[in-house]
Amino acid sequence: VHSPFQSDPRFIKNYEISKKPRPAKSFATLIAGIDKSLGDLMDHVTEKGVAENTLILFVGDNGSDGPLGDTYGCFSSAPLRGKKGTCYEGGMRVPFIGSWVKAGKENPFKIARNHLHHQQIGTVMDIYSTILEVGGAKNPEGHVVDGFSLRKQLSGQLNPQRPDHFMCHFPHSHRSSYFTSYRKGDWKLIY
């Protein structure tokens, strides 16, 4: 969901009696729209008979862009510090949800039901390697890949191949200064 927040007319009636401000109601209708679209997608791949071979990845690209200080607002990154364009966790840590539409018994990459795994770092650079491995494809010879497959993490296991460090270089002036941050384990260096 990204600004500007224009209400999805299919769901606005669900929030008419809410005492939340208009932007929060609009945001809620957009979340309902995402939920409906995801359900439609899952129904479609099930009808086509490919649900057991379909992995859905839901990923954010950056933290919320909500105003700082509005800890309980619908656009907040709380309890994380910061927001989009900042060097803090609220600007860089985002949801990454992976799930098979229907986990087949024969699927070697099955994700355990109700399983949450958040002990290892992952980045959008890892998506390409993950899709290659899960899809049984090989990286073209000579093609350099910066990411690591998240297949083990998506199966609830730790991946010993995935380093525990991450560097973010942000050479843009987006409501903040330019910055570089380096994270290793529980530590982060910000420059």
Labelled PLM ranges:
Residues 1, 8, 59-62, 100-101, ...:
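Active-site-proximal beta-strand/loop segments in catalytic clefts of secreted hydrolases
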Residues 1-14, 42, 46-55, 89, ...:
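Active-site regions of oxyanion-processing enzymes, predominantly non-cytosolic
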Residues 33-72:
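Metal-dependent active-site segment of extracytoplasmic phospho-/sulfohydrolases and closely related
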Residues 11, 23, 27-30, 34-37, ...:
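Stable alpha-helical elements in mature extracytoplasmic
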Residues 64-87, 106, 110-116, 120, ...:
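C-terminal cap/loop subdomain of S1 sulfatases and analogous C-terminal strand-loop tails that border
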Residues 1-26, 65-74:
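Active-site His/acidic residue clusters
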Residues 1, 31, 38, 55-60, ...:
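Beta-strand elements within well-structured catalytic alpha/beta cores of enzymes
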